[in-house]
Amino acid sequence: MTAAYYKTEMEFFVDMQRCIGCKACEAACAECETNGQQSMIHVNYVERAVTIQTTVQVCMHCDDPVCANVCPADAISKDEFGVVHTANTARCIGCSNCVMACPFGVPFKEEKYDMMMKCNMCYDRTSAGKKPMCATVCPSQALYYGTREEMRQMRPNSVPVNTFQFGKLEVKTKVNIMMPAGSTMLKVD
């Protein structure tokens, strides 16, 4: 894959504390011509004792993608920029191994096409030097595509974390979650 304009210093950041649940990201993602009018990002509402927390579910683009590792058809690939691409339509057999294996619960099987679909970080845009659609429309900047230095200046009390612990499994990702200063890892029980 050639991406003459892909900017390697750019990273994707998710700040759950800033998400207002407006779903502008979902609408923008669904409008992308590569998604078949499906959103590859999802806003979830988690009921708390007296409030509702919104969470954003997006592909984390793992350094060692479990979805690709369990694919018997070798349909899922990771490129030299760390982007884990959605299943190759000519190879995907629709087995759903990737759907069941992803620790973040991101890939889904599109029954209409009998294949796996997921976010590819708007590769058609990012490889041309543009931002992913979801990050361009987020009014609260809960989704941000930029440099670590920009993020440091914008959020001095937070740090980007891209290491997650699921039991004994440690997963490193291309996408960062903003956490309180001093955090180095997010443990998911």
List each language-model region with its residue ranges.
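Non-ligating segments of multi-cofactor redox enzymes
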Residues: 1-189
